């Protein structure tokens, strides 16, 4: 449900200038993977139950490469790694989730034009291939892992760019065969995020669409009713949903190529007014992450860019301060947050396509 009402926000937005990065620093040993790997994204979680965050890296994009599992040494460095599975894939995402409710994190693999995969954790951080799901001809770009039918088990919403999007329901044993299509065939969806926007007790889906298509919100539990979000002239590459202004209602953040990025503020009825923009009109933002970088109780924004320095935006409760970090020459496809050093502050992992993936450690104290 979209309203033309322009919501009055309690804070002002950022200026067009960027400040020097003072919060995050890289380390020569805090890199992951090969410099020539075409990494699309990464996920973080404690896969071996040793108390620190490990990292799964999705490699390949359109080209066949091997995905990797990196194990944290307890100090934020990743000196041990394993290949995921025995074959190379054209992978875009590798989210972690406990799909069988056995207490450990499993891996779901989103592949381009080959079937998607499920790897189950043996409880010790080793991953065993379990099954395929999806169609070989699908252009899968993103996965949203969330319980969509309120049965207590996570399901999978699949973003298939310019082919049919699907929901795959969990059979309560971590197997995904029962599927439901939603939206029109040919919707150019890149990413999906989820929240209960209309507060009816069911999770809804918000889609980031490319190719001149408007973004959409599909409402659960049947995902037939939808509303548009944003303009039809934007190339949206990422979407997230969080309560950015601490009013108790989740908002929607979208990032775009060749246009400013946007925050759509939600209200108690699930309406979204005209957006507040951040960044510059020539930004080429490929991905975003949301988290409290400075532990001040409100949410900040991190943007990963293609051929530009990456950015983070610090929310001080009244405005956002913008900072740049990383190399302008990098093709950054993904951004992942996690406290990799267990010091109580979030660090930033940037997934680069054609150069090494880099961890930027939070210098806050």
Question: Over which residues does each language-model region extend?
Answer:
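Blade-level signature of beta-propeller repeat domains, shared across WD40, Kelch, NHL, RCC1
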Residues: 333-365
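Sec-dependent signal peptide recognition
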Residues: 2-11
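Short glycine/acidic-enriched loop and turn motifs that connect beta-strands
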Residues: 60-64, 114-115, 163-164, 211-213, ...
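Beta-strand-rich domains and repeat architectures in extracellular enzymes and scaffolds
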Residues: 33-60
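Hydrophobic h-region of N-terminal signal peptides that target proteins for export
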Residues: 11-19
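Beta-propeller blade termini
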Residues: 40-49, 92-101, 120, 141-150, ...
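Hydrophobic beta-strand segments that make up the repeating blades of beta-propeller
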Residues: 55-60, 107-111, 156-159, 205-209, ...
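Blade-edge motifs of beta-propeller repeat domains
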Residues: 19-37, 71-89, 120-138, 169-187, ...
